C-alpha cells in the first residue's frame, strides 16, 4: 500500500496578519482621538461663552457708571447755520440764537499791475505787525516774488502769502492765520528799493476782506467772538456758526435718551446672544437627534442659571424700578429678553431713577451683571476653571495617545518579528515536507517493482 502525506504548512501573508492585529491594538487610540475631538469642541464652545460674557460684562459696566445717565445732547433747528454740541456739564435748556455776522480772517492783495518784474522785488525790510507783535523780514536785492512769498510764510507772522495770476500780472495775496479783529495786521516797508513798497499796508496793498469778530445774540444778549467756534460762551455747550441767519435758530439741550436707550438695547442683545447659545448647546435636539456640545456640562448649565437668576432679582436701589421688567425688559420662556418699547421709553424720561437702578453698588442692575462677569471670568471663575480643566484633559489625552502609539509600535515590531520567524519555520517545514514526499514516492516505486 503506497505511503501518503498531507501538505505541511504554506507561505504566510505576514503583513496582512500583523496589520489586522495592530488595528485591534489601535482601537483604544481611536477612542482617545474621538474623545479629544469632543474635548476640543467643548473647549471652543466654552471659549464662545466667555466671549459672549465679556460682551455682557462690558455693556453692563457702561450701564453701571453714573456719568452714562447724565449725558446730554444738543439739537439745532438749523444745523447749517448753528451747530451745537453738548458737554458733560450741560444742563437741560433752550436757547434762541441769531447770527448777525461771522468771524473772518483779514485778506490783503497787491494792487493790479504793481508788480511788473517778478524776478527781482528789490531790497528792504518788511515789518508785519499783529496786535503788539512785530515781525521784521529782511529782503535782499535780487530776491524774486516767489522767494519773498516763501520768506513771509517761514516767518509765521500771522499771515500766509500766495501768488495769484489774474491777467494783470502777478499779485501777492496775504491771508490772516486767525479770525477776529485782534488778528488784523499792518505792514511797514522800510529802506525799500524797487517794487517792495507795493507790499506795505495800508498805504500800498488793498484790503479785500477785513478781520472781523462774529456777532450774535443768544436769548437777546449781544455776543462778540473772535472765532466762529464758541466754547465757554454758554456753559456746557459748544456752538459752531456757519452762516448769518434771517430767523432765530433754536438750540435745545436735553437728556441723551437715544444713547441711554442704545446702551440698554445693547445689553439686551448681549444677554440674548449668550442665553440663546447656552440654551442650544446644553440641550438635546429631538428633531436633529444631535446633542449640544455642552449637554451635561455643569459649568455651562450653571452659567445659564446664574444669568437668568441675576436678571430676575429684584433691587432696592430705586423705589421706581425694582425689577428689569419695570423698564420693559421681560424674560421670555426661551430664556431671552423681550423689550417693551413703550415701557422703556417712559423710563428713559426719568434718567435720575434709571441711574440709581443701574449704578448703585451691589444692588444696581448694571453693577450686578458686571460683578457676575468679574466672577465667572476671573482667575478662579466658573468659565476660567472649566477652560483650564478642558485644556488639562486635552493635554492628558495627548500624553495617553503618545504612550499608546509607542506601545502599538512595540507590539507591531514584536508581531512582525514573531510572524516572520513563523513564516521562516513554515518555509523550512515545507521544504522538509517536499523531501519526505519525494522519498515516499521513491519508496512506492520500489515497492511496486517488488
Residues of each region from the PLM?
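Short amphipathic alpha-helical/adjacent loop interface patches that line ligand
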Residues: 36, 43, 53, 419, ...
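Bacterial flagellar/type III secretion structural subunits and associated motility module proteins
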Residues: 1-37, 50, 54, 58-169, ...
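Structured, hydrophobic secondary-structure cores that serve as assembly/anchoring elements
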Residues: 279, 286, 412-426, 430-440, ...
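Conserved short loop/turn motifs at secondary-structure junctions
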Residues: 35-45, 285-296
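Amphipathic, heptad-repeat-like alpha-helical segments
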Residues: 45-48, 429
Amino acid at each position: 500500500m503506497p505511503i501518503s502525506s498531507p501538505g505541511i504548512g504554506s507561505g504566510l501573508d505576514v503583513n496582512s496578519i500583523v496589520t489586522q492585529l495592530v488595528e485591534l491594538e489601535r482601537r483604544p487610540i481611536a477612542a482617545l482621538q474621538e474623545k479629544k475631538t469632543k474635548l476640543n469642541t467643548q473647549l471652543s464652545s466654552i471659549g464662545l461663552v466667555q466671549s459672549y460674557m465679556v460682551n455682557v460684562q462690558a455693556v453692563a459696566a457702561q450701564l453701571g457708571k453714573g456719568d452714562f445717565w447724565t449725558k446730554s445732547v444738543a439739537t439745532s433747528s438749523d444745523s447749517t447755520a448753528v451747530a451745537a454740541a453738548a458737554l458733560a456739564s450741560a444742563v437741560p435748556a433752550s436757547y434762541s440764537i441769531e447770527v448777525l455776522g461771522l468771524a473772518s480772517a483779514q485778506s490783503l492783495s497787491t494792487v493790479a499791475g504793481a508788480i511788473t518784474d517778478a524776478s527781482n522785488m528789490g531790497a528792504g525790510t518788511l515789518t508785519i505787525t499783529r496786535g503788539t507783535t512785530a515781525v521784521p523780514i529782511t529782503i535782499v536785492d535780487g530776491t524774486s516774488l516767489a522767494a519773498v512769498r516763501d520768506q513771509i510764510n517761514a516767518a509765521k507772522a500771522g499771515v500766509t502769502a500766495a501768488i495769484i495770476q489774474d491777467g494783470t500780472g502777478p499779485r501777492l495775496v496775504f491771508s490772516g492765520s486767525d479770525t477776529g479783529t485782534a488778528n488784523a495786521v499792518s505792514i511797514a516797508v522800510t529802506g525799500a528799493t524797487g517794487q517792495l513798497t507795493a507790499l506795505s499796508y495800508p498805504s500800498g496793498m488793498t484790503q479785500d476782506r477785513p478781520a472781523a469778530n462774529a456777532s450774535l445774540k443768544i436769548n437777546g444778549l449781544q455776543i462778540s467772538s473772535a472765532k466762529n467756534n464758541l466754547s465757554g460762551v454758554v456753559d456746557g455747550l459748544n456752538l459752531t456758526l456757519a452762516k448769518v441767519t434771517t430767523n432765530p435758530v433754536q438750540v435745545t439741550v436735553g437728556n441723551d435718551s437715544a444713547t441711554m436707550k442704545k446702551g440698554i438695547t445693547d445689553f439686551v442683545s448681549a444677554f440674548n446672544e449668550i442665553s440663546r447659545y447656552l440654551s442650544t448647546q446644553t440641550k438635546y435636539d429631538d428633531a436633529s437627534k444631535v446633542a449640544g456640545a455642552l449637554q451635561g456640562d455643569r459649568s455651562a448649565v450653571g452659567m445659564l442659571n446664574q444669568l437668568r437668576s441675576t436678571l430676575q432679582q429684584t433691587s432696592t436701589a430705586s423705589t421706581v424700578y425694582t425689577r428689569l421688567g419695570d423698564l420693559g425688559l421681560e424674560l421670555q420662556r426661551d430664556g431671552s429678553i423681550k423689550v417693551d418699547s413703550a415701557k422703556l421709553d417712559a423710563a428713559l424720561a426719568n434718567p435720575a431713577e434709571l441711574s440709581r437702578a443701574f449704578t448703585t453698588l451691589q444692588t444696581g442692575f448694571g453693577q450686578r451683571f458686571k460683578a457676575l462677569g468679574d466672577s465667572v471670568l476671573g482667575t478662579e471663575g466658573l468659565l476660567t476653571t472649566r477652560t483650564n480643566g478642558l485644556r488639562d484633559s486635552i493635554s492628558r489625552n495627548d500624553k495617553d495617545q503618545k504612550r499608546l502609539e509607542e506601545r502599538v509600535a512595540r507590539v507591531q515590531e514584536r508581531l512582525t518579528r514573531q510572524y516572520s520567524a513563523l513564516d521562516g519555520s513554515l518555509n523550512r517545514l515545507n521544504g522538509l515536507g517536499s523531501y519526505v514526499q519525494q522519498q515516499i514516492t521513491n519508496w512506492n516505486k520500489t515497492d511496486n517493482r517488488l
